Amino acid sequence: MNLTRIPQPFLTRFETAVRQNNTCRKGVMNMTNSEMQEAFLKQQNELRDKIEPVDKFEIRDLKLVAGVDLAYWTSGDDEYAVCCIVIIDMQTHQVTEKKQFLGRIEVPYMPGFLAFRELPLILKTAALLESTPDLFIFDGNGYLHPRHMGIATHASFYLNKPTIGIAKTYFRVDQKTDYTEPENEAGSYTDIVIDGEVYGRALRTHKDVKPVFISVGNYISLDTACTLALQLTEKESHIPLPTRLADLETHIAREAARES
C-alpha cells in the first residue's frame, strides 16, 4: 500500500524519519519532552482544520475493511509494541490479508499525544499491505479527543482513506464530561456532547452488552460510522470484527515476541 505524501510543514522530525524508512529514534533523539510536545501540539492544531467528518464514499462501494490495533510490552528498560492490521471482505466478513510489524517505542507517553507513539508502527505495517483497504477502523478514538486528533483521525492524513475510531473504554476528554448509557437494545446510542459539540457516540451493538465508543476519524460521518460498526459486529462479540481480529492477532504476536 502506498502511503500519502504529507507536506513537509505537517511533519515532525520523528515522522520525517519514519517516512524515509529510518527508525523513529533518529527523529526524536535530540528533542526534549517539552520540544516534542510543542511540535506535536502544533501539528495537531494544523491538521485539525483539515478534518472532514462527512461521507466521502458510498457504503455500497466498500469492499475491503481493515482493523488496526497495537499491543505493548516491556523488556528491561525498553518498551516495545506490535501493530497488526487485518483486512476483511465487507460482504463475506472473511479475512483477505493480515500483516504485522514489531518495533521499539521511542516516543514517551504524553496524554493527548498517543498517536505519535503509534503512528510509526502503523505506517510501517500499512506499507506491507499488498491490497488497499477502502476503510480503516482503529481500536481507539478519533474525533473524541481534546483537539479531535485521536489516532483514527491523525492516521487518516497518511492513509488517505476514511477512518473510524472504536474504543472499548470511555475517554473523558475534559475529565468531567461523562456519557449517558444508551437503552438496552442493539443499535441504541447516545451522543457524547462536550460544550455543545458532538464528539462521538456510545453505541450498544448487542442487547445486554457494554456499549462501544464511536468517533469519526476522517472522511466519514458519525451516522455512517455507527451504521458500519453495527454491520461489522457479529454475534460472538460486541466489538466490530475488523478490530476484534486485529486485537486477537496483536495478543498472539506479543506472546510470541515475549517468548522469543
Write out the residue ranges for each language-model feature.
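Two-metal-ion RNase H-like nuclease active-site motif
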Residues: 63-74
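A short acidic-Thr-Gly-centered motif at the start of a beta-strand
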Residues: 51-61
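Short, Lys/Arg-enriched N-terminal segments with co-localized hydrophobic residues
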Residues: 18-30
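Catalytic-site beta-strand/loop segments enriched in glycine and acidic/polar residues
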Residues: 122-153, 159-161
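A contiguous pocket-lining binding segment that forms or flanks enzyme active sites
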Residues: 145-198
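A glycine-rich, hydrophobic loop/mini-helix early in the fold
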Residues: 76-132
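C-terminal binding/interaction regions
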Residues: 32, 36, 40-43, 47-51, ...
